[in-house]
């Protein structure tokens, strides 16, 4: 979202440019809203990148244990000891049988990828959104512009994030042969080559482009309903972000299952499907999932995915908007001083 002064039309009806306040109307505004309205209508690229990096790191750090469970639930042929019926039960069993810190294995590599990936993502999204809104709609927000901007930003995000996804998902699997991110990177590099880190890239894009399109279009629509003036409103960001993330997650679960299979290359599942060597390509992944589990296989882990994405997107939006607000306000204050 862009920093706005009370809505698409900048100066909203409740605020007069000449400072005239009738019936005590100006006094009813809280200081935070007034401060936000006085900020510039757009933030700098460095602000978008810093706020985006913080949002990505905090989002993935907080939700990482649930992400670990989701990865295991999407396994096509899990070990009998790694069959779970609920997220809580899975986390409890993993910590009891594999160690308290086991659900966090791979968090370090995820944080290293999430920071720069989200920094580029939000910076690209904000600038593309502003440019495309001028092209598609001169009166305000265009849902088409938001969807296209999110899709374009996804290309940059996934280029950085895909190698981190490959490593962290292999570390998350039950009985993983890798004990650390470094050993996983070294083994994959030596045995499968550089291409292994991008084997699921096309599937990742095929999943994330519709995911982000649904996410941003839904988010902007909900913002119009719960926050029509587009003020800085953390509660509206949390609600809109959470619901948009849940809907997008449910709709794209089949693609996420295929991505997980391409990333993890489950040996037992591939042998049951008579796949020799390494599985590659989205079409092959779709065919293998159906061969092993039928239509139900495409929705393995949907509960964990929705439960993961709903708070994740809520955290991401609220943290991003908070840091963007703080950083832009500080830049404005420094500019005023000098």
From Swiss-Prot:
Tissues where the protein occurs: Highly expressed in hematopoietic organs, fetal liver, bone marrow and spleen.
Pfam short name (any one): Mito_carr
Transmembrane segments: 45-64, 106-125, 143-162, 200-219, 234-253, 301-320
Gene Ontology biological process terms, A to Z: iron import into the mitochondrion; positive regulation of hemoglobin biosynthetic process
Start-end of each Solcar repeat: 43-131, 141-225, 232-326
Catalytic activity: Fe(2+)(in) = Fe(2+)(out)
Name of the protein: Mitoferrin-1
